Design a protein with these regions (language model features):
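Active-site-adjacent "lid/gating" segments in soluble enzymes
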Residues: 32, 36, 100-242, 246
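Short beta-strand "acidic-cap" motif of Rossmann-like dinucleotide-binding folds
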Residues: 19, 35, 39-44, 187
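Flexible, small-/acidic-enriched active-site or ligand-binding loops
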Residues: 331-374
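A structured beta-alpha segment of the ubiquitous adenosine-cofactor-binding alpha/beta core
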Residues: 18, 58-110, 288
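Substrate-binding/gating loop at the entrance of the active-site cleft, primarily
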Residues: 20-34, 46-57
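Aromatic-enriched alpha-helical interface/lid elements that frame and gate functional surfaces
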Residues: 230-302, 306
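Conserved PLP cofactor-binding pocket of PLP-dependent enzymes
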Residues: 300-324
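Short, Lys/Arg-enriched N-terminal segments with co-localized hydrophobic residues
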Residues: 1-8
Length: 374
C-alpha cells in the first residue's frame, strides 16, 4: 500500500542550497539534502574532472554551474545568487572564502537569513586550522586509530572514510538542519564550523569514558569491542570470515550451540582472562572446520549475532537490503539508467525522488547564470 502523500511530499523542498564543496564530505552532505528534496546547486571550477569517478552518484539530483572564483564577475554572480539561497556549504581551507569576498560576514550582509556551513579537517580555529590532511590523518589525530587493529599488525586500514562521512558529512547535515529550525523560530541564519577531527573525536563515545573517568589507556586488543574479547572476526575453512558479536547470554548460548559445542557456554560466562582466551580459541578453531557457506546455512537457524562478512557485490544482492530498496536505478540523462545506492532515510510520508545522475559540470549555466536581471 502506497504511503499517504508519498508521491507529492518532499521533506526539504523549501530549501535552496549553494554547494561549493569538493571531494567527499560536502558533496555527500548535500547529496543527503538533495535526496530529501532540497534544491541543490553545485558550483564547480571550469574544467573540473571527476577524478574518482563518483560524481554521478554524489551529484545526484543536483544542478550544476561552473564559476572561476578568481574572476570578479564570478564573485558578483555568487553574490546575486546568494540572495535567493538558504544555505551555503563550502570546504576550502579557513580564510579562503573570506579572501574571495565570499565569507560568512560578507554574504550575511546580503542575506541575513543565510546558513553558512564550513567543513574542514581541523576547524576554523586552533593551531592545526591551516594544516592539510585526509581521512586517515583526522581519525589518527582523533585517537580512533590508536586502539584499532592489532598490536602486531598496527592500526586498521578502513575501506571507507570515517572522518569524511561519519565525521564531516553527517554532522554537517545535523548542524544545517538544526540551524534551519533555529531560523524558523528566530528569523536569523548563522555560521556552522564543522571540524572532521572534532566530529571523529566524538566517535570515541563508548570507549572515551573508560579513559576519561576510569584512567584506562585505550590500546588495541584490550577492550571488549576491539579484539580483547571473543567479539571479533573468525576465518572459515575456505579463507573467508564471519563476524561474531554474541555479547548477551542468550546469543552467546546460541553461538555455542551453532558451532556444536554447547558445553562452552559455561566457560564463556567466566570473567577471568584465561577463560576468555580459551573461549575465543575454541570459537576460532570451530570456524576453521567448515566453509563460509556452510556456516551461513547453520546460522540461519540461530539468533546468535553471528553474520557473514560479505563483499560489496554480495551485500548489494542481500535479500534484506533488496527488500529495503537500497539499490536504485537513476536516469543518466542519456536515455539509460545507472545503479546507485539509495537514500537510507525512510518515513511514513516521504519517498525520495532520484531526478537524475550527476550532471556535466556547468550544464545549468545558461539557465541560471544568464537569466535577465542577474
Amino acid at each position: 500500500m502506497e504511503r499517504e502523500g508519498a508521491r507529492l511530499m518532499t521533506l526539504l523542498t523549501h530549501l535552496k542550497v549553494l554547494d561549493f564543496s569538493t571531494l567527499l564530505p560536502g558533496p555527500f552532505a548535500t547529496l543527503m539534502l538533495a535526496d530529501l528534496g532540497a534544491d541543490v546547486l553545485k558550483v564547480e571550477r571550469p574544467g573540473a574532472k571527476d577524478s574518482w569517478g563518483v560524481n554521478q552518484y554524489l551529484n545526484r539530483s543536483k544542478k550544476s554551474i561552473t564559476l572561476d572564483l578568481k574572476q570578479s564577475d564570478s564573485i558578483e554572480s555568487v553574490k546575486k545568487l546568494v540572495k535567493e539561497y538558504d544555505i551555503v556549504i563550502e570546504q576550502f581551507r579557513p580564510g579562503v572564502m573570506e579572501r574571495l569576498g565570499l565569507g560568512y560576514e560578507a554574504l550575511k550582509s546580503i542575506n541575513p537569513k543565510l546558513i553558512y556551513c564550513s567543513i574542514t579537517g581541523f576547524g576554523q580555529t586552533g593551531p592545526y586550522k591551516d594544516r592539510p590532511g585526509h581521512d586517515i590523518n583526522y581519525i589518527s589525530i582523533a585517537g580512533l586509530s590508536g586502539y584499532s587493529g592489532t598490536k602486531k599488525g598496527g592500526p586498521a586500514k578502513n575501506g571507507t572514510q570515517i572522518a569524511d562521512l561519519a565525521g564531516g558529512s553527517l554532522h554537517a547535515v545535523i548542524g544545517i538542519l538544526s540551524a534551519v529550525i533555529h531560523r524558523e523560530r528566530t528569523g536569523f541564519g548563522q555560521a556552522i564550523d564543522i571540524s572532521m577531527t572534532d566530529c571523529s573525536f566524538t566517535l570515541n563515545a563508548i570507549s572515551a569514558p573508560l579513559n576519561l573517568q576510569g584512567g584506562l589507556e585505550l590500546e588495541p586488543e584490550k577492550m571488549m569491542l576491539n579484539g580483547g574479547s571473543f567479539y571479533d572476526f573468525y576465518e572459515t575453512k575456505d579463507g573467508r570470515h564471519f563476524s561474531v558479536g554474541s555479547l548477551e547470554p542468550p546469543f552467546r548460548k546460541a553461538l555455542c550451540e551453532a558451532i556444536g559445542a554447547p558445553e562452552l557456554y559455561e566457560l564463556s560466562m567466566k570473567s577471568d582472562e584465561e577463560s576468555g582466551i580459551r573461549f575465543k580459541t575454541a570459537i576460532r578453531l570451530a570456524f576453521l572446520e567448515r566453509d563460509f557457506h556452510e556456516w551461513q546455512e547453520i546460522f540461519t537457524d540461530f539468533e546468535a549475532c553471528a553474520e557473514p562478512v560479505l563483499t560489496f557485490t554480495e551485500a548489494a544482492e542481500h535479500p534484506q537490503l533488496k527488500e529495503r530498496g537500497m539499490i536504485v536505478e537513476v536516469p543518466d540523462g542519456k536515455g539509460n539508467v545507472q545503479k546507485q545506492i539509495a537514500c537510507p532515510i525512510k518515513t511514513s510520508v516521504f519517498t525520495p525522488e532520484y531526478k537524475h545522475a550527476g550532471l556535466r559540470p556547468g550544464q545549468n549555466n545558461a539557465e541560471i547564470l544568464r537569466t535577465p536581471n542577474r
